[in-house]
Regions:
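A long amphipathic alpha-helix within ATP-dependent nucleotide-binding catalytic cores
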Residues: 7-16, 50-113, 152-153, 158-168
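Phosphate-binding site of ATP-dependent enzymes
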Residues: 2-50, 99, 103-118, 126
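ATP-dependent carboxylate/phosphate-activation module, predominantly the ATP-grasp catalytic core
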Residues: 28-83, 122-151
Length: 169
């Protein structure tokens, strides 16, 4: 089956396997003239890589939980995004939200937590942006929570999930 699938798709791509600790993203807004850092998204994915939930917490708390290399990455990414989107700036429209998905991981033989600086770039309003904006508008810096996106087949399933989450939190 594998060879037939490769022939049908026309190519194969291989990537290194990472011993992932945590998924997170740096979130930016590309406006008409500037690139603004709007915050972090700390999130969990399920086994298939689908977004499961976002951690609602202050940017400072998220940044404190990440390796110090992230502060350098934030400055570098803002500069790179500014250069990348420069031809689109100073127009009558804005590019909008950009989320750079990253991860912390451990490499073989190294106990230090490392950062993969760009797993994926999303040129859209991601669930991470929604969670970040929800936190910024509704919670205090001392509060924390989780932001779930869960497809529910029916009201009973949704009510059961609500009961489960209420009991857990």
């Amino acid at each position: 089956h594998g060879a037939a699938t490769i022939r049908k798709m026309g190519s194969i791509m291989a990537e290194p396997w990472y011993d992932k600790e945590q998924d997170f993203a740096m979130l930016f807004y590309v406006g008409r003239e500037t690139v603004e850092f709007i915050g972090y998204s700390l999130f969990d994915n399920d086994d298939s890589g689908t977004y499961r939930c976002g951690k609602l917490m202050a940017n400072e708390r998220i940044e404190a939980s990440l390796p110090s290399a992230c502060a350098i990455a934030k400055k570098t990414l803002r500069k790179i995004l500014g250069e990348m989107f420069a031809p689109l700036m100073n127009k009558t429209w804005e590019v909008g939200y950009v989320g750079i998905d990253m991860m912390t991981f451990r490499s073989a033989g190294n106990t230090e937590l490392m950062v993969h600086p760009c797993v994926e770039m999303n040129l859209r309003c991601t669930m991470g942006v929604v969670a970040r904006l929800y936190f910024d508008r509704n919670l205090t810096t001392e509060q924390t929570g989780e932001f779930y996106i869960t497809p529910a087949a029916d009201y009973a399933t949704l009510a059961q999930l609500d009961s489960q989450l209420t009991a857990e939190h």
